[in-house]
Each structure stands twice: as C-alpha cells, then as structure tokens.
Amino acid sequence: METQRLRIAMQKSGRLSQDSQALFKSCGLKINLREQRLIAHVENMPIDILRVRDDDIPGLVMEGVVDLGIIGENVLEEAQLIRASQGLPAQVKTLKQLDFGGCRLSLAVPDDVAYTGPESLAGKRIATSYPGLLKRFFDEKGLNFKSVMLGGSVEVAPRAGLADAICDLVSTGATLEANGLKEVEVIYRSKAVLVQAPNPLNEAKQKLIDKLLPRIQGMQQARESKYIMLHAPKDKLDAITDLLPGAERPTIMQLAGDTNQVALHVVSSETLFWETMEQLKALGASSILVLPIEKMME
C-alpha cells in the first residue's frame, strides 16, 4: 500500500544541506534535522525528509523511491546523461529552480599553460567528476579528449601528473589558485532545483505539493523584493515611480497637514541601490525607508 506521507530527499551534508533546511523552515515545516537520522518526520504536515548523498538523489527520484528531491542541476543532469546511456530511467519533473546552490562547472589548466579555446585541450587528459557533462561539451565542439574519472580532489590531478587539465565545480576560484590552476572556460552553470518523480502521485500527495509550491515561490519573491516607503512631492510622483524597478501600483496616501506631499508605499522586485536612493532624494523624496520582506503571496 502506498504511503500517504510525502517523501522528500535532500543532501545530508554539504553546500545544499543548510539552504534546504532553511527553505523547509521558511515554508512553515516544523522539523528537527539536528540528529544524525536518515529520515526525519515533519511535525505539522505528512512529510518525511530523507537525508542522503547528493549523488543518490536523482536515482531515488527517477525510480520513484521518493516523491521530491532538492538537487543541484549539475548533479541532476550528469545523472540523466549517465543513466540514459545505461538504459535506466532518467526522467524527472522540474518544479522550481531555487535561489541557492549557484555554481559553475569549468575547465581549468595549470597557470603556465596557454589556453586559446577548447581546441587547446584536444587529445589531452582531463580529470573530472562529471564525465557526462564534459563529454557532451566536447562532443558539441567536435573534439576528442581523454577522460580521467576522479571521485574527489580533482584539482590535484595536474600536479600529480594524472591529467593535463581539469573540469570541476568552481565557486570562488580560491581552490584552483591554491593548486596552481586557472579557470579558462565555463561549460555549465547550475543552481539547486526542486524535482518530482515522473509518475503521477496520489491525490493527497499532489495536493500537498500544490500547497508547498506557492510557499516556496513566495519566499523567493520576498528575498528578491523590498518594501519601500517614502514621502514624495505630488508633482514628482511619475518621475519617482519610474525610478523604482519592478514597482507595480504603489499605495499613495495624503500626508496629514501637507497638501503638496504624499506618502508612497511600494514593493520593488529588484535591489534598490544607493544611487537610486540619491536620485529619489534629488527629485524631492524624503524619509526614504527600504525594508526586507519576510513572506509574500500573490
């Protein structure tokens, strides 16, 4: 008998783990993930959280072992390429790209090696943990190379004489620099995504997903938006609202005892920079407040 509890897989530890936990909390899920248990139960919703290795999440979702998974696009697409080549199920439904887990998969070569393009690495040994994505990139360029598969510490491969170049995830580039390497080309950009198993779920689970998605969307919109309050001269309202990026239908209220100014409240969907605030002030705006938004729902 199919369980009525929604099962969500997330990374047990690593760069996506804390962000996934924060996402669950912001969506109102009461859960204790401090203990080293592989399965945690949400207290206020029929949801179970499975804490697993990130490499295992795509297969668990594709096979229908779990209903949802939070995974990096790089790990997901690598798994899809490898599984498809092996004749295994490789389909998922991508429900939402999330606003965390950003990284890039890049080619890097030793500092003293000249790089003029992918053709510079034709026939060379390239160490990577992402052979599928790397092969696809070079296939699209019509170039051959020798793949050196490593499960970790890819950046030491050139210095150890195992490879001529590497293809690895890059965040700041500090690890590359520490190992005498330079980033020369980005072949894939990735963020975390929420994915669903390909087969239809029962009505109870689907209703729960339909309840969670607007919460996730609202949290992401809130993080990307600011609530702006200011006093503005009536004759400058059009110019002032034009300066507020993403603003829609501001709330305008008459100031007590002042017939020439109004109070303007608006949600702006983009960051308000100091330069914009200075322009607002130059137009006569005053008492400008920019506040974070905790939650939003359209």
From Swiss-Prot:
Subcellular localization: Cytoplasm
Record keywords, A-Z: Amino-acid biosynthesis, ATP-binding, Cytoplasm, Glycosyltransferase, Histidine biosynthesis, Magnesium, Metal-binding, Nucleotide-binding, Transferase
Keyword Glycosyltransferase part of the UniProt annotation: yes
PROSITE patterns assigned: ATP_P_PHORIBOSYLTR (PS01316)
Gene Ontology terms: cellular component: cytoplasm
Record-linked Pfam families: HisG, HisG_C
Functional summary from the UniProt entry: Catalyzes the condensation of ATP and 5-phosphoribose 1-diphosphate to form N'-(5'-phosphoribosyl)-ATP (PR-ATP). Has a crucial role in the pathway because the rate of histidine biosynthesis seems to be controlled primarily by regulation of HisG enzymatic activity.
Family: Belongs to the ATP phosphoribosyltransferase family. Long subfamily.
Stated name of the protein: ATP phosphoribosyltransferase
Species per Swiss-Prot/TrEMBL record: Aeromonas salmonicida (strain A449)
